[in-house]
Protein backbone atom coordinates (compact mmCIF):
# COMPACT_ATOMS: atom_id res chain seq x y z
CA UNK A 1 0.00 0.00 0.00
CA UNK A 2 1.34 3.38 -0.97
CA UNK A 3 0.25 6.83 0.18
CA UNK A 4 -2.55 7.48 -2.31
CA UNK A 5 -4.29 4.21 -1.41
CA UNK A 6 -3.74 4.85 2.31
CA UNK A 7 -5.14 8.36 1.99
CA UNK A 8 -8.25 7.12 0.19
CA UNK A 9 -8.81 4.51 2.90
CA UNK A 10 -8.27 7.10 5.63
CA UNK A 11 -10.95 9.29 4.08
CA UNK A 12 -13.49 6.47 4.52
CA UNK A 13 -12.89 6.77 8.27
CA UNK A 14 -12.39 10.50 8.69
CA UNK A 15 -15.41 11.77 6.80
CA UNK A 16 -16.07 15.39 5.91
CA UNK A 17 -16.73 18.22 8.40
CA UNK A 18 -17.22 17.64 12.11
CA UNK A 19 -17.48 19.76 15.24
CA UNK A 20 -18.40 17.17 17.88
CA UNK A 21 -18.61 18.70 21.35
CA UNK A 22 -16.78 15.73 22.92
CA UNK A 23 -13.90 15.81 20.42
CA UNK A 24 -10.89 17.67 21.87
CA UNK A 25 -9.75 18.27 18.28
CA UNK A 26 -12.65 20.67 17.79
CA UNK A 27 -13.56 21.51 14.23
CA UNK A 28 -12.19 19.08 11.67
CA UNK A 29 -12.55 18.47 7.97
CA UNK A 30 -11.29 15.23 6.45
CA UNK A 31 -9.92 14.53 9.94
CA UNK A 32 -7.62 17.58 9.87
CA UNK A 33 -8.02 19.62 13.03
CA UNK A 34 -8.37 23.37 12.87
CA UNK A 35 -5.12 23.73 14.85
CA UNK A 36 -3.17 21.72 12.27
CA UNK A 37 -4.82 23.56 9.37
CA UNK A 38 -3.81 26.90 10.90
CA UNK A 39 -0.24 25.65 11.52
CA UNK A 40 0.16 24.99 7.79
CA UNK A 41 -1.22 28.41 6.88
CA UNK A 42 -4.87 27.71 6.08
CA UNK A 43 -6.98 30.72 7.09
CA UNK A 44 -10.39 29.85 5.67
CA UNK A 45 -13.49 28.30 7.16
CA UNK A 46 -12.84 24.69 8.17
CA UNK A 47 -15.96 23.63 6.25
CA UNK A 48 -14.10 24.70 3.10
CA UNK A 49 -10.70 23.08 3.73
CA UNK A 50 -9.60 21.75 0.31
CA UNK A 51 -9.12 18.00 -0.06
CA UNK A 52 -5.75 18.55 -1.78
CA UNK A 53 -4.51 20.45 1.28
CA UNK A 54 -5.68 17.62 3.55
CA UNK A 55 -3.81 15.17 1.30
CA UNK A 56 -0.60 17.24 1.57
CA UNK A 57 -0.98 17.51 5.36
CA UNK A 58 -1.39 13.75 5.74
CA UNK A 59 1.60 13.03 3.51
CA UNK A 60 3.96 15.55 5.10
CA UNK A 61 2.88 15.39 8.76
CA UNK A 62 1.96 11.72 9.18
CA UNK A 63 2.91 9.33 6.33
CA UNK A 64 6.46 10.60 5.77
CA UNK A 65 7.42 11.06 9.46
CA UNK A 66 6.47 7.45 10.28
CA UNK A 67 8.40 6.34 7.19
CA UNK A 68 5.40 4.31 6.14
CA UNK A 69 6.76 3.55 2.66
CA UNK A 70 9.72 1.76 4.29
CA UNK A 71 7.63 -0.39 6.64
CA UNK A 72 6.31 -3.87 5.92
CA UNK A 73 3.23 -3.57 3.72
CA UNK A 74 1.08 -5.34 6.33
CA UNK A 75 1.65 -2.61 8.95
CA UNK A 76 1.99 0.54 6.82
CA UNK A 77 -1.58 1.67 7.04
CA UNK A 78 -1.93 0.76 10.73
CA UNK A 79 1.12 2.86 11.66
CA UNK A 80 -0.08 5.76 9.49
CA UNK A 81 -3.63 5.59 10.87
CA UNK A 82 -2.32 5.50 14.45
CA UNK A 83 -0.17 8.57 13.73
CA UNK A 84 -3.23 10.41 12.46
CA UNK A 85 -5.28 9.59 15.57
CA UNK A 86 -2.66 9.67 18.32
CA UNK A 87 0.37 11.46 16.91
CA UNK A 88 3.52 10.40 15.10
CA UNK A 89 5.50 9.84 18.31
CA UNK A 90 2.87 7.62 19.90
CA UNK A 91 2.45 5.58 16.72
CA UNK A 92 6.22 5.14 16.48
CA UNK A 93 6.38 3.95 20.09
CA UNK A 94 3.68 1.34 19.51
CA UNK A 95 5.56 0.08 16.46
CA UNK A 96 8.86 0.04 18.35
CA UNK A 97 7.43 -1.89 21.30
CA UNK A 98 5.76 -4.32 18.91
CA UNK A 99 9.09 -4.81 17.09
CA UNK A 100 11.08 -5.20 20.33
CA UNK A 101 13.27 -2.10 20.08
CA UNK A 102 13.70 0.92 22.33
CA UNK A 103 10.55 3.05 22.21
CA UNK A 104 11.93 6.54 21.66
CA UNK A 105 9.16 7.73 19.34
CA UNK A 106 11.39 8.19 16.29
CA UNK A 107 11.39 5.64 13.49
CA UNK A 108 15.01 5.22 12.45
CA UNK A 109 17.22 2.47 11.01
CA UNK A 110 16.92 0.15 14.03
CA UNK A 111 13.14 0.38 14.09
CA UNK A 112 12.91 -0.19 10.34
CA UNK A 113 15.25 -3.19 10.50
CA UNK A 114 13.35 -4.77 13.40
CA UNK A 115 9.95 -4.11 11.83
CA UNK A 116 11.02 -5.52 8.48
CA UNK A 117 12.53 -8.63 10.14
CA UNK A 118 9.41 -9.36 12.20
CA UNK A 119 6.52 -11.60 11.29
CA UNK A 120 4.15 -8.99 9.78
CA UNK A 121 0.94 -10.48 11.20
CA UNK A 122 2.38 -10.79 14.71
CA UNK A 123 3.81 -7.27 14.49
CA UNK A 124 0.43 -5.91 13.46
CA UNK A 125 -1.37 -7.74 16.28
CA UNK A 126 1.04 -6.41 18.90
CA UNK A 127 0.79 -2.86 17.55
CA UNK A 128 -3.01 -2.86 17.41
CA UNK A 129 -3.33 -4.37 20.90
CA UNK A 130 -1.28 -1.49 22.33
CA UNK A 131 -3.32 1.05 20.42
CA UNK A 132 -6.63 -0.37 21.60
CA UNK A 133 -5.48 -0.45 25.24
CA UNK A 134 -4.34 3.18 24.96
CA UNK A 135 -7.59 4.34 23.36
CA UNK A 136 -9.74 2.49 25.92
CA UNK A 137 -8.10 4.52 28.70
CA UNK A 138 -8.91 7.89 27.12
CA UNK A 139 -11.64 10.00 28.75
CA UNK A 140 -13.33 10.32 25.35
CA UNK A 141 -13.73 6.52 25.03
CA UNK A 142 -17.42 6.62 26.04
CA UNK A 143 -18.20 8.99 23.17
CA UNK A 144 -15.94 7.54 20.48
CA UNK A 145 -14.85 4.09 21.68
CA UNK A 146 -17.22 2.01 19.60
CA UNK A 147 -16.05 3.68 16.38
CA UNK A 148 -12.38 3.51 17.38
CA UNK A 149 -12.67 -0.18 18.24
CA UNK A 150 -14.29 -0.92 14.87
CA UNK A 151 -11.62 1.10 13.09
CA UNK A 152 -8.76 -0.64 14.89
CA UNK A 153 -10.14 -4.15 14.51
CA UNK A 154 -10.85 -3.54 10.81
CA UNK A 155 -7.09 -3.15 10.35
CA UNK A 156 -6.66 -6.84 11.15
CA UNK A 157 -8.73 -7.74 8.11
CA UNK A 158 -6.75 -5.71 5.58
Predicted segments, located by residue:
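Cell-wall polysaccharide-cleaving catalytic domain and substrate-binding groove, primarily
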Residues: 1-158
Amino acid sequence: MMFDTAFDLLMTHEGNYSDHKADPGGKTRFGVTEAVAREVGYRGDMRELPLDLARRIYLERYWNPVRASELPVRVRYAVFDAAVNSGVGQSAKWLQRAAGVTADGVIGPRTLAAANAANPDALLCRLLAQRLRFMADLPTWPAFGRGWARRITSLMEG
